[in-house]
């Protein structure tokens, strides 16, 4: 059967046909909470990647990667006889999808292998880069993940071209499916930005779309638009910005605006941004030998016979000098396989004028007769210097110009800035150092790592823990407040980039101490009481034992849950307290939740309903649908609403860990009606069907568990009397999971 002959919609097997999403486009996608099912992983459940990595002959692997750089293959020959530029781009485009807003993207899961990233126009030809690596991946097997290998290869590529790097940490276990929790944008055409910008443009339809195709479209204002959150790319299918300029318009000043927006959302400042662009563009070349009409479909749209390759090129040989990747044809320096300062030397030495690439894309050529740029395949050919519109931004934008002129005269400063920014690019989503493995971890600890101090004292033992629980409960603080505080501390965790969590006790620092959801006045009261308990214990404990406030906050919540449930709740000490100097307060602002379903906080935005935001929060906490459900029900029973309101507290015995929330929500004798939306937005009232008496009030956070079929099915399990003990057991297990999400020092495997 030929490609395109049998669309999935018409297939009558294997999940084909009209789907639930086709009938109900707004259906809550609970399936995103099933993504991390271990059954999707072909490796055994006890596989420990961090331990496997430690068995790796790291130096031998790097030696093999270095040899690969100059082992040009006939089926995909290396530019200038060196694959360095290709592999730098592969690593950059793997890590560069990270965005600080929600911590998603990045290279930590090796997602470049899967849709949609493997088919993005910005990733044309990276299918070949990964295939070149397969023999090495096959050789070293489970000791090196694809996620680590793609990034390490970029590091080795730099080193092989004379650019000393800052270091490298392994420890990224592979995933084996596309991450469908990520919002990459709402556009339905490649290079489109008509959703992410209110005045954006439709993209390009058809097969074989490449970066340099947007100049073919009509354009709107590119100077004053605002990029929607949480995306960090100016176009669908690009990592950052359009190399031709915004929407294909070759305007370096407007391009600088887009560059700042996208790189800042990747947690890079202006200096780091400039260093990455200059450093990355010091190597290799772009490819635009002919118009994109010569290229075939992306890998996901191709025939089985191509075996994962896409963008088959009909121009000439389809490779080497005939390659079409971006549609632009630029080699930045005269030393494309060697680190140098020639990028900046050329940028400022020459004046530049617009030209069209052989593919018709906008690019810049030096106003000179100097032919000093080597040809990638013909040693007898030389070319004029050329640049991209985004390169022109490094000179023409006043802010970037100030930075880059300094580096022109001080190249060592550029090198230091580049290798630090490159290291940050590759490791920003790795989380704490307790996840890092390998012999090249730098000794210098960087602020963006969100460091916490090492444990430098003896930890509390069981007898101490019991005594501390007693002191906490006798300190005069309501148990519900202790539970809310512990939850607030731990639930800041993001499984996407492994930031946040209880370790560090940053809930006592700005900005977390001032977040509305954390009820600052109540939080200050609880922290003051716990600091008193801490001071008393640390001042009198024997054997050098101490307890951190981070541990005490979690222990306080644990003690309160135990009191409410009458069961034992796990607790493992070992957290430490971060200082203000170890905390980038501005960076932590991105962790503030839009909603918290567990504390009944927040409401719909103009783009997402409350329950969709709740699902996103649960996904970041790496919860399953049953865990989400049992935690919400338990927190309501424990009277843990952020503002102490009664909404969703469907029980006559608040403060006891019961399944009353589910029993009363699903009571068939209760009729729910929306309250007056002008006074009480997103509030619902539950009335007795016979008497008409109002019994309860609830929010969308609450009622979704009776409305959504899958969530209701789970809620019904917990509403049954024969599952009341199961409810308590499951709540305690899920509670402990959230409290320990960031305890990578305890986990059997890094995940």
Curated annotation (Swiss-Prot):
Gene3D superfamilies: 1.10.520.10, Peroxidase, domain 2. There is a cross-link at residues 240-266 (Tryptophyl-tyrosyl-methioninium (Tyr-Met) (with W-92)). Heme b binds at residue 281. The record marks 89 as: Transition state stabilizer. It catalyses: H2O2 + AH2 = A + 2 H2O; 2 H2O2 = O2 + 2 H2O. Homodimer or homotetramer. This is Catalase-peroxidase. It comes from Phaeosphaeria nodorum (strain SN15 / ATCC MYA-4574 / FGSC 10173). The lineage of its organism: Eukaryota, Fungi, Dikarya, Ascomycota, Pezizomycotina. The gene is katG.
């Amino acid at each position: 059967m030929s490609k395109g002959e049998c669309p999935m919609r018409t297939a009558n097997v294997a999940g084909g046909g009209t789907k639930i999403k086709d009938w109900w486009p707004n259906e809550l996608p609970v399936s995103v909470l099933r993504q991390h099912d271990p059954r999707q992983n072909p490796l055994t459940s006890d596989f420990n990647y961090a331990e496997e990595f430690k068995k790796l002959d790291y130096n031998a692997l790097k030696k093999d990667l270095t040899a690969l750089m100059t082992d040009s293959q006939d089926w995909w020959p290396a530019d200038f006889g060196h694959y360095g530029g290709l592999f730098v781009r592969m690593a950059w485009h793997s890590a560069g999808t990270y965005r600080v807003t929600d911590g998603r993207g990045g290279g930590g899961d090796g997602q470049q292998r899967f849709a949609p990233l493997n088919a993005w126009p910005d990733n044309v030809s990276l299918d070949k880069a990964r295939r070149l690596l397969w023999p090495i991946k096959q050789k070293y097997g489970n000791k090196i993940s694809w996620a680590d290998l793609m990034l390490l290869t970029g590091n080795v590529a730099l080193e092989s071209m004379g650019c000393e790097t800052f270091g490298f940490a392994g420890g990224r276990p592979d995933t084996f499916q596309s991450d469908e929790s990520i919002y990459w944008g709402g556009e339905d055409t490649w290079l489109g930005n008509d959703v992410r910008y209110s005045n954006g443009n439709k993209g390009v339809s058809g097969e074989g779309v490449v970066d340099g195709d947007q100049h073919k479209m009509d354009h709107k204002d590119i100077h004053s638009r605002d990029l929607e959150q949480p995306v960090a790319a100016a176009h669908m299918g690009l990592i950052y910005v359009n190399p031709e300029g915004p929407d294909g318009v070759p305007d370096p000043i407007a391009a600088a605006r887009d560059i700042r927006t996208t790189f800042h959302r990747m947690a890079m400042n202006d200096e780091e941004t400039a260093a990455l662009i200059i450093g990355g563009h010091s190597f290799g070349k772009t490819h635009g030998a002919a118009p994109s009409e010569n290229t075939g479909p992306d890998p996901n749209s191709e025939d089985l016979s191509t075996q994962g390759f896409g963008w088959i090129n009909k121009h000439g040989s389809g490779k080497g000098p005939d390659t079409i990747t971006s549609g632009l044809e630029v080699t930045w320096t005269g030393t494309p396989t060697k680190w140098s300062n020639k990028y900046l030397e050329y940028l400022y030495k020459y004046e530049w004028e617009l030209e069209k690439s052989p593919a018709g894309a906008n690019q810049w050529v030096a106003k000179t007769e100097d032919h000093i740029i080597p040809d990638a395949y013909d040693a007898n050919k030389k070319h004029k210097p050329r640049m991209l519109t985004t390169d022109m931004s490094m000179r023409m934008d006043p802010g970037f110009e100030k930075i880059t002129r300094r580096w022109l005269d001080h190249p060592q400063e550029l090198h230091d800035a580049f290798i630090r920014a490159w290291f940050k690019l590759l490791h920003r989503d790795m989380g704490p150092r307790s996840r890092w493995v390998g012999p090249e971890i730098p000794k210098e600890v960087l602020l963006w790592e969100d460091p916490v101090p090492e444990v430098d004292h003896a930890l509390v033992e069981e007898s101490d823990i019991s005594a501390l629980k007693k002191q906490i409960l006798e300190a005069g603080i309501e148990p519900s407040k202790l539970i809310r505080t512990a939850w607030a501390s731990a639930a800041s965790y993001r499984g996407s980039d492994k930031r946040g969590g209880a370790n560090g006790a940053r809930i006592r620092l700005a900005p977390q101490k001032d977040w509305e959801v954390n009820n600052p006045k109540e939080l200050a009261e609880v922290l003051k009481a716990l600091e008193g308990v801490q001071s008393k214990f640390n001042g009198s404990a024997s054997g050098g034992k101490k307890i951190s406030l981070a541990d005490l906050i979690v222990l306080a919540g644990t003690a309160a849950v135990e009191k409410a449930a009458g069961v034992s709740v796990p607790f493992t000490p070992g957290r430490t307290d971060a200082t203000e100097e170890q905390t980038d307060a501005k960076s932590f602002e991105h962790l503030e939740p839009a909603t918290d379903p567990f504390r009944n906080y927040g409401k719909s935005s103009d783009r997402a309903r409350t329950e969709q935001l709740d699902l996103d929060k649960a996904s970041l906490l790496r919860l399953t649908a049953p865990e989400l459900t049992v935690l919400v029900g338990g927190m309501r029973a424990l009277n843990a609403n952020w503002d102490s309101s009664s909404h969703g507290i469907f029980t006559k015995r608040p403060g006891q860990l019961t399944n009353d929330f589910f029993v009363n929500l699903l009571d068939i004798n209760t009729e729910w009606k929306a309250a007056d939306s002008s006074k009480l937005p997103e509030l619902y009232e539950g009335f007795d069907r016979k008497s008409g008496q109002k019994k309860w009030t609830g929010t969308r956070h609450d009622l979704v568990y009776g409305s959504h079929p899958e969530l209701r099915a789970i809620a019904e399990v917990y509403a049954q009397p024969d599952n009341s003990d199961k409810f308590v057991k499951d709540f305690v297990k899920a509670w402990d999971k959230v409290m320990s999400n960031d305890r990578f020092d305890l986990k059997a495997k890094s995940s």
